[in-house]
Amino acid sequence: MPKKNKNLCVDDLRHAEYYSMQETFDKLYQKSKNGEVFKNLMDLILSQNNILLAYRNIKANGGSYTAGTDKKNITDIGSKSPDEVVEKVRFIVTGSKHGYRPKSVRRKDIPKPNGKTRPLGIPCIWDRLIQQCIKQILEPICEAKFSNNSYGFRPNRSVEHAMNRTYTMLQRMNLHYVIEFDIKGFFDNVNHSKLIKQMWSLGIQDKRLIFVIKRILKATIKMPDGSLIEPHKGTPQGGIISPLLANIVLNELDWWVASQWEENPIAVSRGRYRIIGKTEVFDKSHGYSLMKNTNLKEMHIIRYADDFRIFCRTKEEAVKTKEAVTKWIEERLKLEVSPEKTRIVNTRKRWSEFLGFKIRVRSKSHKYVVQSAICDKKVEIETDKLVEQAKNIAKPRKTKNCLLEIQLFNSMVLGIQNYYQLATCISIDCRNIHRRIMTVLTNRLNTEKVCMLKRDGGTVTETEKERFGNSKMI
């Protein structure tokens, strides 16, 4: 397996240290961990260093060049001096007698593989900058309160960590019944009042900040036909702060599921510290043993944004857990669980799908081991994308030449391998994809008279050499 860069969020850390904000973030995290409340966060949010750090961070994102309803992007902010940027942000948030009023959010429908569309809300660039300022201050406060079972849109956490935890549940803990939950239109149906209460309970009690966040949630949406809609629920997908708000909403679910078993008072009260190697860990195994003699249902959650799975030991426990969690989500979070897409999977007999992977367990030497592969739908989608790009190699588009098309094709292949390399059957999946791609390339290159490929030095990147150096195709 190729070496992977484990230095997650290095740029964010370097930028924060450059603007002398990392120490502030660390203090916020520790205060939140100690249970303190925060009633004066706006001064930090509108501090010069935090605003300049926010600009630095969103500038590094390619999406910052996408214009909102005011037709402006990051280059319009970049044309101003640092002092002018700081002054403008402060004026937008606090300068008006009516308070902060974000401009309309541009609605754009993004096609999905199933033929449907995903509504994307693109705020104006100044509003995105303000959201980034807020996110930077709220994130360390929320991180101190978030559950370890949540992996999506969080610093130093990724799909890789979520899948490793999934493998642990199935192979080491033998929790083979998986409940696949689906919340109907989660981002479009977040209850605003519930969200504000959850923020308050996390210690975010600055009324000026709460006012600003309410205005962000209530920002009008400009539809493609030019009409304006005032939202009464939901957070716009595409907003910088939306993933953090989504995690705040579902954090309550994480802790509720954990309280049923993993963090149950019986397990915690019977736990004790042990030294394993050179590390001191809190061992709750004695409490878990006692809980198995009760009517409590063992359940463990793994969540990535609004996509989550709950693992159970038996089918009976899974059925009761599915009913209890569905009822809790609908009553407490005011969200609707899709009965058609929510199901219980016995991974000893069928595949369970999660984050683009399909997973099951198989018997081997009197135990069960994990077997994983790319989801069938994802294989089809990725193959179709590569086939289209292979056709572009044979007949380059007007704005590109053959070499650029090859480089784009290689980057797509690397992207697939980097994401799915955790699958145990990745080589089989890639072999099947490769077979179809080579058929297309062979046919196209033999028939397209205008296409002649030559081996030119210097067209292979260091990453490609490291990954495919021994391949005959290099």
Where are these regions (language model features)?
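Intrinsically disordered, low-complexity and often Lys/Arg-enriched segments
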Residues: 1-33, 266-284, 290
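Conserved pre-catalytic core of RNA-dependent polymerases
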Residues: 7, 12, 16-240
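Core structural elements
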Residues: 46-53, 104-106, 217-222, 299, ...
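Conserved polymerase palm-domain catalytic core
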Residues: 104, 148-149, 154, 161, ...
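A conserved non-catalytic segment of reverse transcriptases
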Residues: 218, 227, 333-401, 405-407, ...
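Short, solvent-exposed helix-loop connector elements
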Residues: 232-235, 390-405, 417-428
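A glycine-rich phosphate-binding loop feature that marks nucleotide/adenosyl-phosphate handling sites
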Residues: 270-274, 341-350, 409-412, 430-437, ...
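A terminal-accessory region detector
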Residues: 426-474
